[in-house]
Regions:
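Glycine-rich oxoanion-binding loops at beta->alpha junctions
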Residues: 43-101, 141-148, 152
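Acidic/polar active-site rim loop that often engages polyanionic ligands
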Residues: 126-139, 162-163, 187-188
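N-terminal phosphate-binding or glycine-rich loops at protein starts, especially the Walker A/P-loop
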Residues: 1-45
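Accessory alpha-helical/coil subdomains and C-terminal extensions
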Residues: 92-94, 100-105, 111-115, 122, ...
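Short, ordered loop/turn segments at secondary-structure junctions
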Residues: 4-6, 34-39, 69-70, 106-109, ...
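A glycine- and small-aliphatic-rich helix-loop capping segment at beta-alpha/alpha-beta transitions
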Residues: 16-25, 48-53, 115-125, 141-145, ...
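Short acidic, glycine/serine/threonine-rich loops at helix termini
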Residues: 11-14, 42-47, 76-77, 112-117, ...
Length: 213
């Protein structure tokens, strides 16, 4: 099992569910946790996991396995050090005699996971991203927490905006989609919500701002 890409809330909770679920089904199950994303799989950097490792971390943010955004390209060409990363991951998989890889991540993570699947490895992925932009699921874990935090930030800024009669522009994360922006904007009572999916006219925005002065 590994976590890859950006960290977010619920990673530990999701891994806890996987580990405790497997341990409850079989007494002889062996679970390996690869450290810092795909790097752990490439360089065989792992540790054995048990249900005890996940006790008391249900509400803890981040990931106890560590994660990485290492910008390597998974091509069938060795890197400058002569390492074929695809073959290295396959070697680790077969050396440990794994039955399946459980991978938690977003779009980039899933692309790599799909490549490994095409190479013949058994892969199960869990949809993790605050952006909520993964196909095949209504809501990814990490999204609701991001909306809650963004909404709380908007609520706090309201007091300063009112006290100083100022206009605030708040930018939130979301990659190329506006799910967090839309939900947090509505919940926080934003006067204008700009989404990457919808073209907008700057003159119309100016008109709304002028109307509030």
């Amino acid at each position: 099992m590994l976590t890859s890409g950006g960290d977010c809330q619920a990673l530990n909770a999701a891994m806890r569910g996987v580990v405790k679920g497997l341990c409850s089904k079989r007494d002889d199950v062996e679970i390996y946790g690869f450290k810092d994303g795909y790097k752990g799989l490439i360089y065989a950097d792992f540790s054995m996991l048990t249900s005890k490792d996940f006790s008391g971390i249900l509400t803890r943010g981040g990931t106890i396995l560590g994660t990485s955004r290492q910008p390597f390209k998974l091509m069938r060409v060795p890197d400058k050090d002569g390492l074929d990363k695809v073959e290295a991951m396959k070697h680790t998989y077969h050396k440990l005699n794994l039955n399946c890889l459980v991978i938690l991540g977003g779009n980039g993570t899933h692309k790599t996971a799909n490549l490994l699947r095409e190479e013949g490895l058994n892969v199960v992925t869990l949809p993790k991203t605050i952006d909520n932009d993964l196909w095949g699921t209504d809501m990814t874990f990490g999204f609701q927490s991001a909306v809650d935090i963004a909404t709380d930030t908007i609520d706090r800024i309201h007091t300063t905006a009112t006290s100083h009669s100022r206009v605030f522009i708040i930018e939130v994360m979301g990659h190329k989609v506006g799910h967090v922006t839309l939900h947090a904007g509505i919940a926080g009572g934003a006067d204008i919500i700009l989404l990457p999916e919808i073209p907008y006219d700057i003159k119309a925005i100016t008109k709304v701002i002028d109307g509030r002065t």
